[in-house]
Each structure stands twice: as C-alpha cells, then as structure tokens.
Regions:
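Active-site pocket-lining/capping segments in soluble small-molecule metabolic enzymes
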Residues: 2-125, 143-147, 151-244, 251-649, ...
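Long, basic N-terminal domains or extensions that often function
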Residues: 140
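Short, conserved phosphate-binding/catalytic loop or strand-edge motifs used
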Residues: 129
Length: 815
C-alpha cells in the first residue's frame, strides 16, 4: 500500500532545535533537518545524534515525521562512517532519509531497511520516467526538480506510485540542482557536498561579442533568482496530487520558520489565501517572489537583478524635503524596525527607525539619518527581535487529556488507578500500589488533584478534565505525581508506537517492469585511447583527422539550432569509415514536457546503430528499452558517480564505460579505476560546463524578457558573463533554450597524460564543443601523440602565458 493519497503534508525546515520546535508548534506535518555530517547545508548548526534523538521523540509523539538529509555525494573514504551514521539514524527512529547519491540508498537498504528513501531534488528528477526509475530502486518519494510547470507536475503525479514532493516556498538555485559545478570550480566549495558559496548571488556584467556590457551597471544580479512563493497555487498543487509541500529554509531564523510554516498551515487548512497571509509571507525573509517555473513564464521577472538580498515587505516610499528624509508608510511599524530604501539606480540604503526619528503620524516619519538621504521604494526589512527562547512550558501544540482517578482492586487489596484519554480516543491506564485511605481530617479536593495532575508544562499534554471518586479520600501528592508521570510515559509510548507502525506499513512498489541491464557490452580492446566530445559534423571530422579513437556526439548541443535527425547517420558513417568508436550522448536535462519530442531524437540515434549510447539521465534506460535498443550503454558525468559503490551499481547494469564526477580528485578517480571492471573515461581538455539552467540571461535581457517568443539573439552573436574579478564566463544556449555557463579557464592536462594513464584512466576525453574544428584537430593530435609516446608532454609548471588554463579538480579537492 502506498503512502500516496493518505496524507497532504506540510514539510518544514529546521537547522536548529529552536527552529524544530517552532516548526512543530506552527503546524508542520513533517520536518526535514540535517545531522552534523553528510548533508547539503553544512553551514547550518544542524543536529547531533543526541539532539536528533530528542527531536524524533517529540515529533513522533505529535505524529510528525522526521526526515534527515543525507543529500550529498559521498567519497570512498567516508563510506564506513556513513554506514554507521545510517545505523544510528535507524536506531533513533528517523522516518526517512533524503538521498542524492545512489551509494547512500544501497547502503541504507542493506543496513536500515525500515528507513524510507526519498530522492533529493539534487537527483534532478524532471520527468515521470525518472520518478519511475527511482521507484524501481525502492524510493517511496521523489522531490521534483524546481524547474517544472504545474502541467508537468500534474502529469507526473497522475502516473506514478511514489509520493511527490514539491518545493513551494523559499530560495531557488539558478542551476538545475545536482548539476552545478560553478562554486566548486571557482572556489572549491561544492553544492554537491553541501558547501555551496553561492556565486549566483554575486554581480555579473552581461557582455556581447565585442566585450561590451549590454546592461546598466546596477542591473548586475543576473544569476540571482527571486524566492519561490506558490501560496496562490496551493489548491492547484493539491488537486494535481502532490503529497508533500516543502518549504526551503534550514539556514533561516526561527521567526521565519514560525511565520512561513504557520501561514502555509492556514492556507492548506482553509483551502484559500487571504490578504493578511500574503502580507505575512512578504514580511518574512525574501528576495522578492516568483512563480515563473510553475506558470512556465521563465525570464527576467524571476530574477532579483538589482538586489540579491532580503527584499522585505513593501510598505510605502521615501522622499526628501528640506534636508530630511520622509518615510511615507502604508501601515504603522514598530519603533526599532529596520527599513530598506531601494533607489531607482539600484542602490540600497537601510534605516533603523529608532527614537532619533520624529513620528509625525502612525504612517509618516521624518529624520536626518547618518546614512544619508535616500529616495525610493520602501520595504520593511525586519522588526525588533524577541530573543526569548520558547520551551515546552510555552508550547501550544499539545494534546488535551482527560483523566479519571479511580480505585482498583485485585480481589484481595485495593490500589490507585489513573486512566488518561486523549480526544482521539487513545487511552492508557496506569496503577499505583497506594491503597486509598479515608481522610482523618481534610480529604484531597478535586482542585488539589487537578493541580498535581496538571503539572504537564514540560510535556506535550495539557489537562482538560479531571474526575475523582466520590468520598473523603486522601491522595498524597507523591502518588498523584507518580501517576501523572507514568500516564505521560505510557501515552508517549503509545503515540510513538502508533506513528512508527503506521509509517512502516506504508511502502511503494514500482510498476516499471523493465530489465535495466544493457543488452550488449562494448569491448574496449585498444585502451588507452583519446576520445573527443563534439557537437558539429566538422568537429567530428577534425577529431577523427587528429587521431581520436572514439567520438562522443550530441547530448547538450552548445548551439540554439536543433539537429536534423539525419546528422546521426552521418556521424555513424564517418566513424565507421575510420574504424572509430561512435557514441551518442543524451542531454543532462530533459523536462517532462520534452520527453515525447526527445524520443524521436533517440529513435534516430538508435536507428543510426552507434557502438554505444552515453547516458546523463537514468531514465534514458527506460526510453532505450522502449525503443528496442540492444547496444552498449555508458554512464556519463550527469549521473554524478562519486564513489566505488555507485560505480558497482552501474556495472551491475552491464554499463560498458564510466565517466565519473568532474569534482573528483585524481586520487579519488584512481581509487574508482582500481575497483572498476570497465574503462574509466575522464575529461582532460576543454571548457567545463559550470551551470545548466532553464533560465537564460540572454533571452531575459537581450531578447523579449522571457523565453517565450525569444528572437534568439544568441544565434547572431555570442555573449558572456564577467565577474567582479574580471573573469569571463562564456554563455552557450542549447536547442531547448537552456543556458550553459562555461568555465572561464580552459582545462589542459597534456602535461599529465602519462600520469593519468599510469593511474588507470583508460580513456582521455577532449571536450571540443567550445572549439573551432582546427583547434580540435590540433589538441586531439597532441593528446594522441603524448599518449603513444611519439610526442613529449609539456612542462607541468604553469607559466605566466598559461595562467588561463586550469587542472580542474585533479589536484584540488572540494569541501
């Protein structure tokens, strides 16, 4: 039986125990959080095991689920610690783990089979068949890519068995999650390891082919998206079949969690949204709001453009008069509030409205702030902080408990009995050996009994009714206290047991009846070899002429113009003529509404009879089987193979070659190659793709402002981004109008070819998609010469003339 259809879950973030309690109190149905290790918010406070144990206990008493993020790529040296960590999570009753790396899933299934597997948005699940693939591996839930439209979400929910989780509020990455290398290649901090430095929140200039900026200087935050806010679309998402509505924010403050979760609780319960709820969401931390992906209106309006930080709640405007600033408000604010002025040139000024300001009226202040005079749109950035920590004494989400004190008997002697009943009907009965006695003077009153039994401040219960036997009985406070404690313990145990049993009864059985194994394995008898990835016919010819023994063609074509389907026959013919291995690649991203069209391309690929097909998305296995493909399959970089267990997973599917993560060091690749039964291929030359985004800066700022009806200026000339340090990042677009941001430095590993081959890397790939054909031929021929010993490798030291090259992550690890 599937959990799908039984619940509608509001899923809250928690980066600290205080935030966790706020999420519980605000009405969350489930809470996701990270431990001190192995999670994608390494800079949050996060939870130690003891703290996590208490959090799980409290949540389960309230029938709230707890999901722990284990959503990063795992290195081989971490696997032993990871296994113990998952065992620890299992022992404390964690309901599910959120996973990116298939190695984590495989280990969890082996050592903690009761823990549910949830596929992270880092898995880039953007199609129904991606969800079905993860269903077949035992995942009970998949978090969809944030780039999907409502129509795509509806289609996926309707046809899958797994639960679907969708982000509805909070920060948004500009790159498809799980496919971003920008932070790690620029500064060594990887989003795939939970340490993203957020280069997308920095300013950039958009340059044309002449190197000239095409935008005003203050329009600089071209990669910084506004925050998601689907509050107006909750009913549509509910109707679509979404199970879990996820709020981003494990790094946010407790006030944010309390306000946003409480507001979404009201919206879900009332099945409508009111103006006060809109204002509540606007007053919390936000960079401005967008629904562009859900409504399929991707473009300029979804980006912050002039300010990537907290926008605040719009509350009026400022103007100047006789050397003073006037704050004209649409509503009153508290003294001590922080307001932000966004000026027309994009500059931002903050004022603290303290007692230095003159309150002309509830909605008008004037002052001479030291920060200077600023005129523009007025936003409420924050209100005075209440730093008081709230414990269970002040906690409001509690069970009402009725208690009945009575006298029990075993036939020989009497004893004291207490029955506690919750509004749900759950009841427990506890006993005490105390024999009720007739009071000599003053019997214990109902008020006294109520006082003792009502001392429930540090529990999740509150006393709503008390009943005691008729008669002048005396009930010592010590007996009443013991009965109260025992009843609370019994209720907590019963509630936790109910939650755990209900949760464990829920499972998903995938309905994909496919044998994923490749039908044929390609024999690489001539390794080592040089391969070339190209996306033009002239590039194919140049690479073959340079001596490449393998051509990888297609996939993410770095050109807006789509291929004619006949191109695949032509590439296969050219490769066959020269006895060169012909491999066709899939894109790194295929959205759900693109699947049917892409299958026509894939059909042409299959009919061209390549030697192999290299997949960047796991669901391609399903599509190839549907098309009757019986050839070899290879695993490429989009699959994020980061360790030996993940390698072995793909080997079991009879994959012929593996191209592991580009964030691995040479030492890590060597470890994988040592345990691999198939050739390992890695990129050694070319411009690495740093980002792939559904959003396109060219369409947004040079075209029409959105991808709809874009005149495709990218076809007429090239564009690039320039950062604060003067680095130039070329922009390329593909036939789906996606934006690909390339590295500013060209990878060049010619000096290390002998070392790479000695370390067990069998195939060295030149990525020539960003090169002219003549350069492709020259570079490929040099790698062939060095690999075969007919040409000497250049010096390893990078001189001043070679400062524009990079060694990637071969000798520089990631955080």
């Amino acid at each position: 039986m599937s959990q799908k259809g039984f619940i509608m879950e509001l899923l809250a973030p928690a980066g600290t125990m205080e935030n966790f309690m706020a999420a519980l109190e605000s009405g969350a149905d489930a809470i996701y959080l990270g431990g001190k290790v192995f999670n994608a918010r390494a800079h949050a406070a996060n939870f130690g095991i003891d703290e996590l144990r208490e959090a799980v206990r409290l949540a389960h008493i309230l029938d709230v689920s707890v999901y722990v993020t284990v959503n990063i790529l795992i290195g081989d040296t971490e696997l032993k610690d990871l296994e113990q960590y998952i065992k620890d999570l299992d022992s404390i009753g964690v309901d599910a783990i959120i996973v990116q790396d298939l190695a984590v899933a495989e280990i969890a299934k082996r050592v903690a089979p009761n823990i549910h597997l949830h596929g992270s948005t880092q898995m880039t699940a953007a199609t129904l068949d991606a969800v079905r693939f993860y269903e077949s591996l035992g995942f009970t839930r998949v978090v969809l890519a944030r780039e999907l439209s409502l129509k795509e979400i509806q289609h996926i929910c309707k046809h899958c068995k797994a639960e679907i989780e969708v982000f509805v509020h909070g920060a948004l990455c500009v790159c498809y999650s799980g496919q971003c290398l920008m932070s790690s290649f620029i500064g060594g901090r990887s989003g795939n390891r939970g340490a993203c430095a957020q280069p997308c929140r920095l300013p950039y200039e958009l340059l044309d082919s002449k190197g000239e900026s095409v935008l005003p200087k203050h329009e600089a935050y071209l990669l910084s998206p506004k925050d998601l806010n689907y509050s107006e679309h909750m009913n549509e998402l509910v109707a679509a079949g979404v199970t879990s509505f996820k709020v981003e924010g494990r790094m946010k403050k407790v006030s944010y969690v309390r306000q946003v979760i409480g507001t979404y609780r009201e919206i879900l319960d009332e099945a409508s949204i009111h103006e006060n709820q809109r204002k509540a969401l606007a007053s919390g931390f936000n960079r401005g709001f967008s629904t562009a992906y859900l409504e399929d209106t991707v473009g300029r309006q979804m980006m912050t453009v002039v300010a990537p930080n907290h926008q605040g709640k719009p509350i009026g405007e400022s103007y100047t008069k006789k050397g003073e600033v006037y704050l004209s408000l649409t509503e009153p604010i508290e003294q001590g509030s922080l307001v932000k002025i966004l000026q027309s040139n994009g500059s931002v000024t903050y004022y603290t409205v303290d007692d230095e300001w003159t309150c002309v009226s509830d909605t008008l202040y004037k002052g001479r702030p030291a920060e200077g005079l600023a005129v523009g749109q007025l936003y409420l950035a924050s209100t005075p902080k209440n730093t008081k920590s709230r414990g269970l004494q002040e906690f409001t989400r509690k069970y009402d408990m009725s208690v009945y004190l009575s006298i029990g008997s075993n036939g020989e002697t009497n004893y004291t009995e207490l029955t506690a009943i919750l509004d749900s009907g759950l009841s427990v009965t506890v006993t005490n050996e105390y024999v009720p006695a007739i009071a000599n003077k003053v019997p214990t009153s109902l008020e006294k009994v109520t006082e003792q039994l009502g001392r429930l401040g540090n529990t999740l219960f509150r006393l709503s009714y008390v009943d005691i036997p008729d008669g002048p009985y005396m009930w010592p406070a010590s007996v009443l206290n013991a009965l109260r404690r025992d009843a609370v313990t019994a209720l907590e145990t019963a509630l936790i047991t109910h939650h755990v049993e209900s949760w464990q009864a829920l499972q998903v059985t995938g309905d994909v009846d496919y044998d994923f194994k490749a039908q044929h394995e390609l024999s690489y008898d001539t390794c080592p070899m040089i391969s070339a990835r190209v996306d033009e016919i002239e590039g194919v010819k140049a690479a073959i002429s340079g001596g490449a023994q393998k051509i990888v063609f297609g996939g993410d074509r770095l050109s807006r113009t789509p291929y004619a389907l006949s191109v695949y026959d032509e590439v296969a013919r050219l490769c066959a003529q020269s006895d060169v291995i012909c491999t066709f690649a899939t894109p790194r991203v295929v959205k759900d509404d693109e699947v049917e069209a892409y299958k026509h391309t894939l059909e042409a690929i299959v009919q061209a009879h390549p030697d192999s097909i290299s997949i960047h998305v796991p669901q391609a296995l399903l599509w190839l089987r549907e098309l009757g493909y019986t050839g070899a399959i290879e695993a490429d970089t989009g699959l994020n193979i980061f360790n030996t267990p993940t390698l072995h997973f793909w080997e079991q599917l009879h994959i012929s070659c593996v191209n592991p993560s580009q964030e691995l060091t040479l030492k890590q690749i060597t470890e994988i190659a040592k345990h691999s039964h198939i050739p390992v291929e890695t990129m050694v030359h070319g411009y690495t793709e740093m980002m792939i985004s559904e959003y396109c800066a060219i369409a947004s700022f040079v075209g029409t402002g959105s991808k709809v009806n874009c005149p495709m200026p990218c076809v007429k000339e090239s564009y690039s981004l320039k950062d604060r340090k003067g680095e130039i990042f070329p922009i390329r677009t593909d036939p789906y109008c996606r934006m690909h941001i390339m590295n500013s430095h060209e990878m060049d590993m010619r000096a290390y070819v002998p070392m790479l081959l000695q370390k067990g890397i069998s195939i060295l790939r030149v990525d020539g998609r960003h090169m002219k054909p003549s350069y492709v031929k020259d570079i490929v021929s040099q790698y062939v010469g060095i690999a075969t010993g007919t040409m000497e490798a250049p010096p390893k030291k990078i001189d001043s003339q070679g400062e524009s090259i990079t060694r990637g992550h071969y000798f520089r690890g990631i955080l």
